[in-house]
């Protein structure tokens, strides 16, 4: 499944580290799933932390009435907060990599 913020998330350093650790495929896949889930929450937390209340209200209204218009709205807001989101993603990946190396 491709996520709407996929271009912001580069998992290649993590995948390289998992391969270097010799982690078996099932555990590897489970860890990637955990990282993807964490990244999703990281992106959404950064997004909502940067939305003003009227934008949050607008997004909720879009989700309730016209979900197709919600995605472009969220993409626009992510673009506006790209620096913070990228920073948060980088920090999250660094934490995962540090844990793997221990």
Write out the residue ranges for each language-model feature.
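Intrinsically disordered, low-complexity linear regions
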Residues: 1-102
């Amino acid at each position: 499944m491709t996520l709407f913020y996929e271009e912001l998330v580069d998992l290649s350093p993590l995948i390289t580290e998992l391969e270097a650790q010799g982690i078996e495929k099932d555990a590897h896949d489970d860890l990637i799933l955990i990282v993807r889930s964490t990244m999703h929450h990281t992106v959404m937390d950064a997004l909502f932390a940067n939305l003003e209340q009227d934008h949050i209200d607008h997004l909720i209204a879009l989700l309730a009435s016209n979900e197709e218009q919600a995605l472009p709205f969220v993409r626009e807001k992510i673009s506006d907060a790209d620096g913070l989101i990228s920073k948060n993603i980088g920090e999250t990946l660094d934490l995962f990599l540090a844990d793997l190396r221990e």
